[in-house]
Amino acid sequence: VLGFAAGGLFDGILLHQILQWHHLLSLVPGVAGLREQVLWDGYLHAFMYVAAGIRLAGLWRARAQLEGKRWRSLVGILLLGFAAWHTIDALVSHWWLGIHRIRIDSPDPLIWDLLWLGVFGLVPAIAGALLLRKPPSDPRRMRSGRAILPLMIATLALAAW
């Protein structure tokens, strides 16, 4: 839940506020005014803050049980949640409901949707899954596993180019 909330906050703050590429309901008829768009963005952010706060409180309460746990597990779960936000946002908001796209002003918004999904959905999901894997006992396997992420990033960059 914490990674999911972080993904929603990252998306909302970067895309809605800083870059201003879209708002939550940019493509919804009848929600055209900037004031209304920003209001709905605020509702999304408030929901994400509440979700993050609840999860942080849960982590605080469970801190004694978490002592000695591997940091890899926590970071891996956070990355999977972050990736889940971007994957669900792309599938539901962009393609199923059609309430917004990553770059509305683009002549081909699908390219931006796919690039965003790859960089902030696929890459964190792979990194999170790799962190959650049991470390291999053979050091040669460990080195080959480390090479997968840079290769995936290079492949996505070439595909986008």
Where are these regions (language model features)?
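Internal/C-terminal transmembrane anchor helices
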Residues: R141-W161
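Hydrophobic cores of alpha-helical transmembrane segments in multi-pass integral membrane proteins
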Residues: V1-I13, Y43-L56, G81-H86, L122
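C-terminal TM-helix exit segments that contain a strictly Trp-centered aromatic cap at the helix terminus
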Residues: A6-Q17, F82-W96, A157-W161
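Interfacial helix-loop-helix junctions of multi-pass membrane proteins
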Residues: L15-L25, A90-D113
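Membrane-interface loop-to-helix entry segments
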Residues: A32-I54, D108-A129
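Alpha-helical transmembrane segments and their helix-start/interface "positive-inside/aromatic belt" motifs
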Residues: V1-A5, G68-I77, G145-L149
